[in-house]
């Protein structure tokens, strides 16, 4: 693991649910969590007043923490809830600040739902980001599988076959579905 440090800001998971979910995919990260290599910051607070000012403050606190912490990777899951209570400009400013931090050597992964943005804002969001991965749920035969599409990776050549299909099996982990099977 080379002593990589990861901070996860989650609006959806508590510490217990995060560790349980990882363990259910045969990814036991409890030691990394216990030693502080992975830290979880739960952003969904009980009795918190969701207002534009509060959201802007949280976004500013997150970006300041990432900028000045000793973390190598920051994961924000999910930015969607913030878009409901703040302006598009605040979200775009947050993403621009995140990109500037990435240019200094840190990695920041942000999940968001595309339905939270207008097409115009979504185009601006995509232009700021270095990579854009689209996760979809597709029906293949009689079961649903997850499909990950690499839409954009800055600096990479566009290649064919930029789709990965997989299933998540509790207790086993992720099972990649071969392209020949996925296309049937």
Task: List the predicted regions and their residue ranges.
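Conserved P-loop
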Residues: 1-46
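Phosphate-binding/switch region of NTP-binding enzymes
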Residues: 112-173
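Alpha-helical scaffold elements adjacent to nucleotide-binding pockets in ATP/GTP-utilizing enzyme cores
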Residues: 17, 21-22, 94-97, 124-128, ...
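Phosphate-binding/switch loop-helix module in NTP-utilizing enzymes
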Residues: 43-103
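Short, ordered loop/turn segments at secondary-structure junctions
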Residues: 11-14, 45, 78-81, 113-115, ...
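Conserved catalytic network of the ASCE P-loop NTPase/AAA+ motor domain
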Residues: 1-2, 30-33, 64-69, 100-105, ...
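Loop/turn-to-beta-strand initiation segments
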Residues: 5, 36-37, 70-73, 104-112
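NTP-binding/hydrolysis catalytic cores, primarily Walker-type P-loop NTPases
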Residues: 69, 163-184
């Amino acid at each position: 693991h080379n002593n990589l440090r990861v901070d996860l800001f989650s609006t959806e998971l508590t510490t217990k649910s995060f560790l349980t979910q990882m363990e259910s995919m045969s990814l036991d990260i409890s030691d990394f969590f216990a030693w502080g290599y992975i830290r979880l910051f739960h952003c969904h607070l009980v009795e918190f007043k969701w207002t534009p000012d509060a959201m802007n403050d949280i976004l500013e606190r997150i970006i300041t923490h990432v900028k000045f912490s000793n973390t190598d990777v920051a994961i924000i899951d999910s930015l969607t809830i913030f878009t409901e209570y703040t302006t598009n400009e605040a979200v775009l400013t947050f993403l621009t600040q995140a990109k500037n931090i990435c240019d200094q050597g840190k990695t920041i992964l942000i999940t968001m739902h595309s339905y939270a943005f207008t097409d115009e804002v979504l185009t601006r969001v995509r232009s700021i980001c270095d990579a854009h991965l689209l996760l979809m749920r597709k029906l293949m035969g009689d079961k649903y599988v997850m499909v990950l599409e690499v839409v954009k990776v800055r600096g990479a050549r566009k290649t064919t076959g930029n789709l990965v299909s997989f299933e998540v099996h509790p207790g086993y982990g992720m099972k990649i579905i071969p392209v020949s099977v996925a296309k049937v």
